[in-house]
Amino acid sequence: MADPSSQNPNLATPPPPSSPSPTHQIQSGTSELSPPSRPPCSTLSFLKTANRPKLRVTSEFDSDSLLFLNKVSCKLFDNLAKLKLSFQNNSQREISQPQVSFTSKHVSVLYDVEEKNTFIKSTLDVHPRLQLRALHNVKAQQGEVAMEANLTEPGYSLELSSPVPIGYPRATLKFPLGEISLQEKDEEEEEKQKRTLSVNGILKRQVMNGVCTALYTDEELRLRYAYKDDALSFIPSISLPSNAASFAFKRRFSPSDKLSYWYNFDSNMWSAVYKRTYGKDYKLKAGYDSDVRLGWASLWVGDEAGKVKTTPMKMKVQFMLQVPQDDIKSSVLMFRVKKRWDI
């Protein structure tokens, strides 16, 4: 916000005093001239120069659900904290899901007005290599505490966490190639409760021109290889022991044209998407999904992946046409608009 004094010099400096007559100078002798009277400060200039936080108002409308998603936020204490109010309202102006949140570097508080519940998250760096974290659900009286220590080797850390008030602790070792977690859990076996050790982890490694990933969770292993260059991406994956396999294929024909295809060998389901961009702020997408037997096309005005504040007029618009394969007459045209105001 511009300072009013820079727009009108008369508000910044008082008018110069009128030159005294020679007679007055002789009579006053060595006495000082009285300072000029200060012009009265108007209420309007005071309001303009008041240091209030700037409000950011964002509203998004979805024609499919006929709902407005509204957010009002401002930064406090020289951008050290953020206060945000979010809520939804329908065409009858009925407000639902109101939430108020306060976020700072070390403490975050989210209050759900309808549920009358508060979620608290805190982070504290007690040492350059030691961090404490805590999560708490006030209504459920449940949470989690965690401690993460960075080891001497770069990229290595050890995290210990435990549910509150009861639960088995979990230990996670993080390293440059992935992470491994260990946690005890109870299993029922022949009407008896048995305690077992659960192992989850993920490993990533560069192989040739791609990345090989192994994800193990809940006694299921998923292997995935992602090859990517400037024009081609090929991503096969398989899950064990179910042997469910799939692959994704992406081909870039030019900087503005791209085709993506996905196929699942287990279910014979597939989907395809063609994308074309026109500059930075226009994107056309068309595709088909065999799982729901639906063809669709969408037009984005404004950067789809970017923030609304970087788009022209701080607004993004999406138009989408959905055409069911089994009933073309029931095709529907939808749109979504997102706009931001800085007050």
Curated annotation (Swiss-Prot):
GO terms for cellular component: chloroplast; chloroplast envelope; chloroplast inner membrane; chloroplast outer membrane; cytosol; plastid; pore complex. The keyword Transmembrane applies. GO terms for molecular function: identical protein binding; monoatomic ion channel activity; porin activity. Its main location: plastid. It is found in: Plastid, Chloroplast outer membrane. The chain crosses the membrane at residues 77-86, 104-113, 130-137, 155-164, 170-178, 220-228, 231-240, 242-250, 258-267, 270-279, 287-296, 317-326. InterPro entries: OEP37-like. The keyword Chloroplast applies. Residues 74-76, 114-129, 165-169, 229-230, 251-257, 280-286, 327-343 are cytoplasmic. Residues 1-73 form a transit peptide. Residues 1-11, 23-43 have a biased composition (Polar residues). It is a multi-pass membrane protein. GO terms for biological process: monoatomic cation transport. Ubiquitously expressed at low levels. Mostly present in cotyledons, and accumulates in seedlings and embryos. Belongs to the plastid outer envelope porin OEP37 (TC 1.B.47) family. Forms an hourglass-shaped multimeric complex. PANTHER family: OUTER ENVELOPE PORE PROTEIN 37, CHLOROPLASTIC. This is Outer envelope pore protein 37, chloroplastic. It comes from Arabidopsis thaliana (Mouse-ear cress). The gene is OEP37.
